[in-house]
């Protein structure tokens, strides 16, 4: 039999349990959808999204742009590095211990190395300067610019610093 205080505790935590479950379900659905995409579909979607990014004033005015390395059929933004290398400085994240990450400069000819989780990263030193535009991966975004990521919190912690 549950005591009154235990019932009160359960009621207080139920919304958080529901939110956690919904986030997990959204992440699973997103991963499932991305897994069934063909390479051609990923390439076409990436091309369309890159074109839209290039049209924005934010991108056009940015001198330093942070990207991400695409995994599991995420939108591939690497063509921006190829197209604008020398005109803009591009950064990619590198994972660190304690669920932290830093960013490093990448050029079109940079040879990437596998990072902590097998995701390619630049082997260069950490970039410490100003970042004008940060493009992040995400499962979902809302109109208030909140994002649902993959659940590790790397980008959340990183973005708090900017």
Predicted regions and their residues:
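N-terminal active-site beta-alpha-beta segment that forms phosphate/nucleotide-binding
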Residues: 2-4, 9, 13-129
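Active-site beta-strand/loop microenvironment that shapes enzyme catalytic pockets
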Residues: 30, 130-162
């Amino acid at each position: 039999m549950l005591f009154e205080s235990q019932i009160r505790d359960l009621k207080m935590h139920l919304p958080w349990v529901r939110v956690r479950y919904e986030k997990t379900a959204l992440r699973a659905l997103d991963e499932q959808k991305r897994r069934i995409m063909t390479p051609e579909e990923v390439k076409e979607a990436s091309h369309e999204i890159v074109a839209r990014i290039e049209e924005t004033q934010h991108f056009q005015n940015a001198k330093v742009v942070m990207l991400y390395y695409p995994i599991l059929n995420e939108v591939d933004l690497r063509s921006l590095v190829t197209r604008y290398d020398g005109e803009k400085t591009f950064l990619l994240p590198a994972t660190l211990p304690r669920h932290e990450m830093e960013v490093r400069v990448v050029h079109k000819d940079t040879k990437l190395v596998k990072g902590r989780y097998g995701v390619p990263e630049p082997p260069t030193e950490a970039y410490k300067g100003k970042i004008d535009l940060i493009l992040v991966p995400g499962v979902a975004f809302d109109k208030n610019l909140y994002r649902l990521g993959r659940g590790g919190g790397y980008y959340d912690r990183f973005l708090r610093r900017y």
